[in-house]
Amino acid sequence: MSRGAVRAVFAVPGNIETPTGGYAYARRLIAAGREAGLLLDHWPLPEGFPETSLALLAETERRLSLAPEGWPVLIDGLACGALPPDLIARLPGPVIALCHHPLGLETGLRDDRAARLLEGEAAALEACAGVVTTSRATADLLVERLGVRRAAITVAPPGTDPAEPAHGSGGSAVEILSVGSLTPRKGHDLLIDALAPLAHLDWHLTIAGAGDRDPAFAAALEARIAAAGLGDRVTLVGAVGEAELDALDDRADLFALASR
């Protein structure tokens, strides 16, 4: 890190070591920032977002208010989009939101809940000094659905690590891998529906992803697999670390992405 490095707070709710794409992005952002002369101090925020309570918001403000005067405060969108604008305005430095996906556009939300989340996130982002998104598609959504000024948005897409070609399963059955938490937006139910008519073919599906984000959906997915008679063709391995995910990638013949 150079002597003239910029320092900023990077506030992330929950455990940053959680094996999901969003948290992996946060970890890599911290590492890449250090190499580029931007020292991001990771500050954990309470779990529970985007659901909030008076106690959760009070504790969040207490932590963020400890930021040194004038330091930029980058807040992960899971929390930032749920913060009241007046709380954001009281913080000691400029606030920048990191938005992976608008909170109110999560698949499976009731219409009234989605509308409240979109309204709240629009107000929160308007109070921010800037917004970072992980894709141009998300940037477009923020402009079109939440009224964010395009000039206020910086797009910072994730990269791809170089890797050797996968060895594949080496067996007679085609090994299919799908990765993502067991939530409606990841579309694992669509994948099961697509594979069910292909039971006469020789294949096996492994789904890697946490099942505790939406327990009701995870239970419904397991029931769907059983009802389709695919209990011995589909394996749910839960959340996995990077080494185990690399091993699953290496053994796979096909990768399936069914996100809505």
Summary of predicted features, one role per range:
Residues 137, 156-159:
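Carbohydrate-associated surface elements
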Residues 160, 168-186, 192-197, 206-208:
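Conserved donor-binding/catalytic core segment of Leloir-type glycosyltransferases
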Residues 209, 218-243:
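Nucleotide-activated donor-binding/catalytic signature segment of Leloir-type glycosyltransferases, i.e.
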Residues 260:
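Aromatic "clamp/platform" in nucleotide-sugar-dependent glycosyltransferases that forms part
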